[in-house]
Amino acid sequence: MTLIKSISGIRGTIGGGAGEGLNPLDIVKFTSAYATLIRKTCKAQSNKIVVGRDARISGEMVKNVVVGTLMGMGWDVVDIDLASTPTTELAVTMEGACGGIILTASHNPKQWNALKLLNEHGEFLNAEEGNEVLRIAEAEEFDYADVDHLGSYRKDLTYNQKHIDSVLALDLVDVEAIKKANFRVAIDCVNSVGGIILPELLERLGVKHVEKLYCEPTGNFQHNPEPLEKNLGDIMNLMKGGKADVAFVVDPDVDRLAMICENGVMYGEEYTLVTVADYVLKHTPGNTVSNLSSTRALRDVTRKYGMEYSASAVGEVNVVTKMKATNAVIGAAGNGGVIYPASHYGRDALVGIALFLSHLAHEGKKVSELRATYPPYFIAKNRVDLTPEIDVDAILAKVKEIYKNEEINDIDGVKIDFADKWVHLRKSNTEAIIRVYSEASTMEAAEEIGQKIMDVINELAK
């Protein structure tokens, strides 16, 4: 059993004793801490908190515990039940609520679940707020409501429709062009909430031919739910059979978007944003943001339009903060998560799909041909395992000194930008490891520079 508490929420495997896994006792404690914080920080004239969940088997149980706890803390609960992460984020602002709790472990296997915490803007708590939730939970500084001040409960299942309406209302979503293109689309929704909302979105976009794979929201994931090539053999084979022009694959909570070309080849998750950004910048030039571990291709496309690209620390809340600071028109937290402020400040696969199909319809190209128009980059992901007594920060400082003549960014670990490649080193908060991400114009070159830096780290660790 596993239970992980961090500034971004609490996640774990279902079952076990107190503190061993994600069980009702820990859920009550953490929900109470969040409810206490929001009571202090919310500036909205509201007593509502929204709760939404993905289709995990444990979702109903976890939701019932969360809802009861919030009501016990005096909050009025709006239960939108089976809903994507971006749907829940939008529901918070549409309801004028003080916050929201999303019950999803994202791309983790079915035995996992988690509580992700939102503020009154439908955005994730920042590090300071997350730490305060952890402190309150540890100190058990809770004050439950008396019998005359218990919260109320309301179920509202209209938010999937409202989410789709908001996507179709975006200026750059060209429904008529998509209809005329007569696209054939395949989807893999890993038997979670994407299976509820994506078919409806595509129908509303005028896509008449949809091949549906794993769209029953049972929570029994038919493959590892992380949308990586090694997990997507079924839909890739379907595409190789010529069944569709493009395939869209989402994770269980529908904030990540991966795509597959008409020939069965992965489009590349990093290029989801690059392509959508190209379309957005063409029509509404502006700045862009992604995290330090994301492809350089976004920078290249942004500069093509004479605009400025900025990199943030890893983590959606950091990307959003940087986007607001730079007035960015589009951004991403990596892994195919498109953040489009014209809709809302959160990763949203529905927005990504609608903008991508609009772009594809305007370009009149095959998906593989469109992909070939962007700069070719390849990212290698590795790690260096160290012993617990080693000072990881000291090693990173030495690496920074060794490469001081290169362009260095140290807002989140150490990123070394060479002329034609980069390496990003990040320490883990929970393990004695350094994650090593590297990018170059070929996978061989990316692996080579990554290995070179790993050799330096291992030498420094002796």
Residues of each region from the PLM?
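An N-terminal, well-structured beta->alpha segment
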Residues: 1-68, 72-73, 152-184
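Gly/Ser/Thr-enriched, mixed-charge loops and adjacent short helices
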Residues: 13, 113-240
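Short glycine-centered, acidic/aromatic-flanked micro-motifs in structured strand/loop junctions
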Residues: 52-54, 187-189, 261, 342, ...
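Short beta-strand-to-turn element immediately C-terminal to the catalytic PLP-Schiff-base lysine
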Residues: 117-120, 258-262, 339-341
